[in-house]
Amino acid sequence: MKTDIEIAQAAEIQPITKIAEKIGLSFDDIELYGKYKAKIPLEVLEKFDEQTDGKLVLVTSINPTPAGEGKSTVTVGLADAFARQDKNVMVALREPSLGPVMGIKGGAAGGGFAQVLPMEDINLHFTGDIHAITTANNAISAFLDNSLHQGNPLNIDPRRIIWKRVLDLNDRALRHVTIGLGGPLNGVPREDGFDITVASEIMAVLCLATSISDLKERLARIVIAQNYDRKPVSVGDLGVQGAIAMLLKDALKPNLVQTIEGTPALIHGGPFANIAHGCNSVLATKTALKLADIVITEAGFGADLGGEKFLDIKTRQLGKQPDAVVVVATLRALKMHGGVDKKELTSENVEAVKKGFANLERHIKNMQSYGLPVIVAINQFASDTESEISTLKELTEALGVSVSLTQVFAKGGEGGLDLAEKLSAMLQAKPDFRYLYELNQPLSVKLDKVVTEIYGGSKVNLSPKAKRQMREIEENGWNNLPVCMAKTQYSFSDQANLLAAPEGFEVTVRELIPKIGAGFIVALLGDVMTMPGLPKNPAALKMDVTDDGKISGLF
């Protein structure tokens, strides 16, 4: 079979103006970025404001293997399947970060015959949104350090600056740096560090903002440091929220592209789900809900991370809950959770599937606990055997849950027709949605609910630093914000090697970081990194471009 990029390059891509017409947008309703990409201005959303929202389908997954389980692929293929059934459908996805693209994953725009196009553009610089976020983030750093240099009128304690610079690459050497060296003309020396851009609070702010004015208000609230009296210092205190919003005004507009089969797709925003909230932008999802009858969207990593955050964080800003949830499962991931070594995952092992099913079962029950109907999509791989597939189907159906074997990677929309048909029936009912916690509950209760009710743990321990931070959060009146757990994606726990569905474990919160602009409190668990490193053999080693500009090796 051809590689993803070979399939994408051989596909017949339509002018973006034709894709816009499918969802009722005229030439004047879009801003072209070349022939195959466009942005949708915010006024267009206002134009369709009275339109009834379409149905919303959330695609999530079990705890993944390092290679991922194909959530984006299933999301795209499912949208194409609905389109084949003459449904007015759109897909809403996150945009990829260059760090993982050049590092371990390669491209991140779906796979096989279920991809979004133009694949190379989306995976590289796209419309420049992530670069704008990088610039906006680092501009705040520059203004902060300038304030220190110019007499420190805000009385900022350089030892208590929490705002870091960012870069959209994996670069471990930048995690801890010293800046301001070289004498008085070069600023105030202090310790600093870099995060990957998609971990920046600016990314989360962009993805949760609903307008330019909301964006400005959120930017102003971002806490960047403490002063010598241990009081918070914000971007608003620097007085640069207007300038930063100016840098982001175009990045705030959703990006319109298409799938291989010509289904309209909005790709906008890309926060990681293990260190941020892991969902595409509220504006993109809102826009899709106004323009389509069915919207398929995804949330990063497993249902314990992106899924939980979509439901407890994003939906509160979106004003709309999913009408159904698709949990993507693969036999290779179930076998990994069943104790099989990663090198043996392509070999048949029915007993490991049975043992690893505990992971899928917990994810199903977690999503059902929100009052949502759930269907399992088995993302089929060539190594899957009939006995493994039938075992997984039987185990899932024994829970009273629908299951569908999807082959969208190999067959595109055709491979998702059964899933689309079963979902159509599920979408007729209105779910009785309920949140995991209420915003007015104490932060300690919210943490406890996520750990005990979603993860299956028994207790939350706070480090001395986290205890102090919790007191400061309460003193500053930030207790009514949702929690955003930052942890490993491979396990329900904070330990990557604790697979399947562990119980009775304790988790330790290392730090509680207030992201007041985004509107949540990040709880750092385990050793999760906000600036990844490159592997020994980065994916970039296989990438190249010919003399005539044709890209190869991008997954």
Swiss-Prot record:
A Pfam family reported for this protein in Swiss-Prot or TrEMBL: FTHFS
Gene Ontology molecular-function annotations: ATP binding; formate-tetrahydrofolate ligase activity
Signal peptide range: none
Pathway listed: One-carbon metabolism; tetrahydrofolate interconversion
Transmembrane segments: none
EC number of the protein: 6.3.4.3
Biological processes annotated in GO: tetrahydrofolate interconversion
Alphabetic keyword roster: ATP-binding, Ligase, Nucleotide-binding, One-carbon metabolism
Family of the protein in this entry: Belongs to the formate--tetrahydrofolate ligase family.
Official protein name in the record: Formate--tetrahydrofolate ligase
Organism of origin: Lactococcus lactis subsp. cremoris (strain SK11)
Gene: fhs
